[in-house]
Every structure is written in structure tokens, then in C-alpha cells.
Amino acid sequence: MAHYMSMSDSQNRRMPDFREARCPSRVYEGSRDDGGCVVTVFDSALPQSDSNPRALSVAASQSIKDCCARFDWGRGDAGALQLAIALLHDVSGDADTALRWYEHFAKTYVRQLPATWAVPELDIALWLYCFQNARPGA
């Protein structure tokens, strides 16, 4: 028995369908340096410039929900929650989606990231699609 319903059956039509990711050429990269944790976004469909790659903004994610003044991953702290909000919002373009899923995304995805990582936007969009479309109790 399938645990997912089609996107057309979903009540929340603002939810991104991973097959129609907003920027499938985007890759998020995280690394640690002396200044803390840095997350950048590179879009291979755009020319490399001062704005590509760009830093993922902690401040922008704090305007949605302020959990922490920094990003972090690999553990279940407030920095991981802030990164979860930032990634979900950047991928979905929707603050409500980020707020609905950030705690679960931090627990199941961000917490598992290694010290240095690269994640295509499509992976995050697929995570959203699967959790948004899972049947209750499945």
C-alpha cells in the first residue's frame, strides 16, 4: 500500500513538488571555519559572480522565527533549527512551509549532516514532498 498521495490530491497546493523544484540547479554547501558555520548557495544555471555563490542568510531566517543567531548542524541544537528554517524557506519560498516542518527537518535531516556537506535543492524538495504527502498514521 502506498504511503504517499499525488501532489494534485494535496490540500496544500503551495507545497513544492520535487519534480518542479524552483531552482533544481542550486546546491547548498556547509562548512566549519574559525568564524563558525558557513552555508553557501551556488546555482550552476547562473554565471559565477559576486552574488553566486551567495551566503545563506541567518538574519533572513530569523525574520521567520528566531531560534539562534547562527547556523549549526550535526546535532539537535538551536543552530540546527535555524538552519532548517533557512533551508526550507529558501527551497520552498514559503515561510509557512518552513515553520510547519523545521523542527522535524532539523531532527531527521540537519542533525545527520557531517562537518562539511553539499546538498542539492532537489534533495530538500523531495524531503518536503514526502513528508507533506505522507498519509496520517503511515
Question: Where are the model-predicted features located?
Answer:
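Short linear sequence elements within intrinsically disordered, low-complexity coil regions
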Residues: 9, 33, 76, 107-110, ...
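Short, charged/polar N-terminal "headpieces" of proteins
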Residues: 1-47
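Short, compact, well-ordered microdomains
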Residues: 91-133
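Generic hydrophobic, helix-prone segments enriched in Leu/Val/Ile
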Residues: 18, 28, 84, 101-107
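Short intrinsically disordered terminal tails
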Residues: 1-2, 133-138
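Amphipathic alpha-helical packing elements
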Residues: 11-12, 36-101
